[in-house]
Amino acid sequence: MSGRPAAWLASSVMPPLGALRTAPAIARGHVRNTLAAWRLSELWDTVELVVSELAANGVNASAGPDGRPAFHNGRMPVIQVGLFTDGAVLVAEVWDQAGGVPVRKGPGDADESGRGLDIVHELTNARWGWHHAPAGPAKCVWAEFPISRASPTAFI
């Protein structure tokens, strides 16, 4: 992401969540509650789906070959979700502790998974990306959503 504002008008960061299959549902609830408080309900469905896909990717990336969380030094991996706005754009970030980079896979028609980043790409009009996190989690995947209206009381 380029050109982050010096200060966000509003932000909401969840506490770390265990990288479990339940994490995307909790992330969706956070998105819905935060956007309701910010009076941005027109973005609910899109942001909720994108964050859910990114959270699911973080959970999957944090799993071992058997699909269970890959504990490191006795600790469960975590993901974390943050929402930020400057009034013109909403940014959703999902951090995870998994190595590797997010890759659009281009699955076949018969594949049951692998479409998450394609969905994110389409719903954000390609306004998404990722970066390595300097401390703590291994990476952050972000997505931007333009805010279609300006409301001076939207973030109070």
What is each of the regions a protein language model found here?
Residues 1-12, 59-156:
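Conserved beta-strand-loop-beta-strand hairpin that lines the nucleotide-binding pocket
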Residues 32, 58-59:
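Short, well-ordered amphipathic alpha-helices
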Residues 51-52, 136:
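Short secondary-structure capping/turn micro-motifs that flank functional sites
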Residues 53, 57:
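Conserved polar catalytic motif of the HATPase_c/GHKL fold
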